[in-house]
Amino acid sequence: MPFKLFDVDAEIPERKKHVYIKKKEDPEEDLPLCNTKTIPGCMTERGCAFAGAKGVITGAIKDALHVIHSPVGCTAYGYGTKRYPTSQEMPDGSLFPIENFNLKYITGTNLTETDVVFGGMDKLKRCIIEAAKEFPEANAVYTYATCTTGLIGDDIEAVSREVSEEIGKDVVAINAPGFAGPTQSKGHQVANYTLFENLVGTAEPPVVTDYDVNLIGEYNIDGDLWVLKRYFEEMGINVLSTFTGDCCHDEIKWMHRAKLSLVRCQRSATYIARLLEERYNVPYMKVDFFGIEYCKRNLMATGEYFGIPERAEEVIKDRMEKIGPEIEYLRNKLAGKKVWVFSGGPKNWHLPRPLEDELGMEVVAVSTMFEHEDGYEKIKKRVGENTVIVDDPNSLELEEIIEKYRPDIILSGIKEKYLAHKLGVPCVLIHSYENGPYIGFEGFLNLARDMYASIYSPVWDLLEFEAGD
């Protein structure tokens, strides 16, 4: 049978549908059950819809102020974002006064029981006005519904329209309370549609060229965006807008002027690429820059689209000369090592082939927290025989996978990292990274370096137990 019930799930037999063992002879439609509510009793690693909107999509915007309409807990949760560094450079050549503004500040309404009983809309209005005065450099305000305000029915959109006129700035209401969907993926969708309907097409870029692209679903985790931008600059391609890494609020307004959209994170941001194509006839291309061969292939595809493949070839040749010798050394050190890829969504199908084909590793397990069926179809095609594919894994399953499949290293998020360490297994952060960037040629080299350093660290020789003992 292709589906597996872990021993720890004996009391939750429904989990069997979420765990799939890859077999070549299985029908294509055999996939883990996904994008459904977490089964009661599971200690899920998922985030909520609000986290998907603020923590992924809008949290990377450099000049926006965020007002969380919630009790203080959700505001604190909204502050715990990924490492999305931002520069001070603005599209018109000016400098935004605060570097990494998006990482430093967040505001909230701090709802109390009284606000829940009598409504919190007046408090939200006061908070937006006060926050705008406290941070006059912010060019826009984004406000968010949460579970509490979604349940009591506060109309954050009406408040946002009213306050926008009063303060003279865009106030964008993101209506993605935590319960809006089974995973943070619903928050991605809501934020995509909200930003498209409220912003796209409302302003023009300062300069346009024949080689303008939107880089969509690239959030500049630990500088990923800046790596890709350098490639494109060397090819003569202008990144007109990013969605939303190191972007300013106004960049989203002129996305409709690009000649092509490149969609990097296809789970969180294909929505807006489709909308741009439908309404403004901006075609989009799904791209993958993790690993050497994928990066080569997608740079060439972009160059060929604009009729400049020779420029892509030059970029590829230059980078391969720089990283080739060290990659070969690290391949020799990592070959045969077992790896478990445990990320939110697309990295689970971006990484298995590069890890196996380019570093000689063996991917023994892949698990995601919010992937959809189309993503699992890609995962299934890209992993080897007997690979374990798990949807919405819980903490006890994590322990059982470590015990039974003995990965030498896990690529995961912060929530899983320290549990893995306690079980004696090295772990490299694949969400926010250790020593990124991890994208592109030099990024893949950084990832290989971090895996090598983690696996061969002498600290593991000091442990008094092994996983499973």
Curated annotation (Swiss-Prot):
EC number of this enzyme: 1.18.6.1
PROSITE patterns registered for this protein in UniProt: NITROGENASE_1_2 (PS00090)
Cofactor remark: Binds 1 [8Fe-7S] cluster per heterodimer.
A single GO BP: nitrogen fixation
Catalytic activity: N2 + 8 reduced [2Fe-2S]-[ferredoxin] + 16 ATP + 16 H2O = H2 + 8 oxidized [2Fe-2S]-[ferredoxin] + 2 NH4(+) + 16 ADP + 16 phosphate + 6 H(+)
Cofactors required: [8Fe-7S] cluster; [7Fe-Mo-9S-C-homocitryl] cluster
Entry-linked Gene3D superfamilies: Nitrogenase MoFe cofactor biosynthesis protein NifE, C-terminal, Nitrogenase molybdenum iron protein domain
Molecular function via GO: ATP binding; iron-sulfur cluster binding; metal ion binding; nitrogenase activity
Positions of disulphide bridges: none
Binding site for [7Fe-Mo-9S-C-homocitryl] cluster: C265, H431
Residue positions binding [8Fe-7S] cluster: C48, C74, C147
CDD domains attached to this UniProt entry: Nitrogenase_VFe_alpha (cd01977)
Keywords from the UniProt entry: ATP-binding, Iron, Iron-sulfur, Metal-binding, Molybdenum, Nitrogen fixation, Nucleotide-binding, Oxidoreductase
SUPFAM superfamilies, per the entry: Helical backbone' metal receptor
Record's subunit section: Tetramer of two alpha and two beta chains. Forms complex with the iron protein (nitrogenase component 2).
Assigned protein family: Belongs to the NifD/NifK/NifE/NifN family.
Role noted for this protein: This molybdenum-iron protein is part of the nitrogenase complex that catalyzes the key enzymatic reactions in nitrogen fixation.
Stored NCBIfam families: alt_nitrog_alph, N2-ase-Ialpha
Protein name: Nitrogenase molybdenum-iron protein alpha chain
Organism (species): Methanothermobacter thermautotrophicus (strain ATCC 29096 / DSM 1053 / JCM 10044 / NBRC 100330 / Delta H)
Source organism phylogeny: Archaea, Methanobacteriati, Methanobacteriota, Methanomada group, Methanobacteria
